[in-house]
């Protein structure tokens, strides 16, 4: 019997190590002809280079080159930290998250959604340590850090896995696109990269949507809770006032969309933003939602309590500091007459039979608006050119040069409120509807004195105390 000496034991160990190494080299080399069929999945995975960076997926820590390392993108439901087994596929498109450049199928690529808007860093195309992670997403070569995906609405779902990143009920896919140029996903993915064909110029280009930023602030609309910067939350403007539903705070299916905005968990409809004036801009992107020439930012607030936008947004949620209130509250839209729509959606705010379009734009008090609707909106902000002033393509101004509505808007009697909110414009004690002498429902054509000023704007009219109901008793009695 051969005696084992320390030298012989060392030699046998070395031989064993050599054999194991040889086997591993054989298995992970480019030739897999001798691998049994049951291990064929290893052949495919080891040969595949999803992002074409020259590093096989088997040793690439970021297979889809989105900057988010695979161990983050695989939610690891089986606990083995291996994206090959039971891989996570958030959007159920057949492409696992770690191979999917658009994991939530909203058209915005994960590399964009994982980063802050103003701190965005594009891939450098350099990978010094050959681990598959772009150098721009490692502090030092080999550190393997990768992006730490942001969660804009703090709902525990990072934006790249959240179909409603700002929690306003409007899908990111809708907010990332212009209204006129909107394209829904086609459901085709020719190159199998997880990005819908509608959002690639050509298969494999991986372009994705370039998210729209309506108000030009620090956040694109899909991360902006007030996309037009009028102080009214998108969640409010996207819905009818009468049927408004706030978020319930529940998300049964974990897709990032509040349950109030899905018919059933997983259906993912979201809100269909309303467009009150049927112009090219839905209300949440329209600074004048009902086309009366008065900006929503003005009409959403009281005249005496009007607060200008500050131009600051410390928490980077898209809502101006002036309207934050407590917990991103935004403005609570004013409703002067208390009977129908809030003022920013009400074409006759004071219910006096004279439209706001007239009362808010009649500076010479002749019953005819000095600025009239043209049907053209050169700067596409939702405010018609007729009300823009001299510069039709001015920088984005949510209040359109109105700094103090109490002095900047028509107010015939100088008391109570400006005309579009004053039931008695001339302060003669007769409500404007009662000065409709001919009873045709239009006080603007009643000029009893013939002086060119309609009675409702003329406190000195000779018929300042009519009997509009014909009962023999003057209206003022």
Model-derived features: positions:
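Sec-dependent, cleavable N-terminal signal peptides
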Residues: 1-46
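Extracellular calcium-associated, cysteine-rich motifs in secreted modular proteins
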Residues: 41-477
């Amino acid at each position: 019997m051969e005696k084992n000496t320390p030298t012989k034991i060392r030699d046998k160990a070395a031989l064993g190590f050599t054999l194991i190494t040889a086997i591993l080299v054989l298995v992970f080399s480019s030739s897999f002809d001798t691998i049994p069929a049951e291990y064929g999945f290893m052949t495919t995975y080891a040969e595949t280079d999803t992002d074409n960076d020259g590093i096989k997926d088997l040793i690439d820590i970021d297979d889809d080159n989105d900057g988010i390392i695979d161990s983050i993108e695989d939610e690891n439901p089986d606990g083995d930290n291996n994206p090959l087994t039971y891989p996570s596929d958030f959007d159920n498109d057949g492409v696992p998250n770690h191979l999917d450049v658009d994991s939530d199928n909203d058209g915005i690529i994960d590399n964009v959604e994982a980063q802050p808007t103003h701190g965005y860093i594009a891939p450098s195309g350099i990978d010094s340590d050959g681990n598959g992670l772009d150098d721009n997403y490692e502090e030092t070569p080999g550190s393997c850090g990768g992006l730490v995906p942001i969660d804009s609405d703090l709902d525990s779902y990072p934006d790249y896995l959240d179909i409603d990143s700002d929690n306003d009920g409007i899908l990111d896919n809708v907010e990332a696109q212009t209204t006129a140029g909107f394209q829904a996903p086609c459901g085709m993915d020719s190159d199998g990269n997880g990005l819908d064909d509608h959002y690639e110029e050509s298969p494999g280009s991986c372009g994705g949507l370039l998210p729209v930023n309506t108000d030009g602030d620090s956040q694109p609309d899909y991360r902006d809770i007030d996309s037009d910067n009028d102080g009214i939350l998108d969640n409010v403007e996207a819905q009818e006032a009468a049927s408004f539903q706030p978020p319930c705070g529940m998300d049964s299916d974990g897709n990032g969309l509040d349950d109030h905005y899905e018919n059933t968990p997983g259906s993912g409809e979201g809100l269909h933003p309303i467009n009150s004036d049927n112009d090219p801009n839905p209300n949440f992107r329209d600074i004048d939602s009902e086309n009366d020439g008065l900006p929503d930012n003005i009409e959403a607030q009281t005249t005496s309590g009007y607060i200008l936008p500050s131009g600051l947004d410390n928490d980077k949620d898209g809502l101006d500091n002036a309207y934050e209130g407590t917990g991103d509250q935004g403005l609570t839209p004013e409703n002067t007459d208390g009977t129908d729509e809030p003022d920013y959606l009400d074409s006759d705010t004071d219910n006096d039979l004279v439209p706001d379009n007239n009362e808010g734009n009649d500076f010479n008090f002749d019953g005819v608006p000095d600025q009239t609707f043209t049907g053209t909106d050169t700067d596409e902000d939702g405010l018609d050119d007729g009300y823009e002033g001299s510069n039709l393509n001015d920088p984005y101004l949510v209040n359109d040069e109105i700094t103090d509505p109490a002095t900047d808007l028509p107010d015939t009697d100088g008391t109570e409120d400006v005309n579009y909110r004053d039931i008695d414009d001339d302060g003669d004690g007769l409500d404007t509807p009662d000065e409709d002498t001919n009873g045709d429902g239009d006080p603007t054509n009643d000029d009893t004195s013939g002086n060119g000023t309609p009675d409702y704007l003329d406190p000195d009219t000779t018929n300042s105390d009519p009997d509009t109901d014909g009962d023999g008793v003057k209206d003022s009695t």
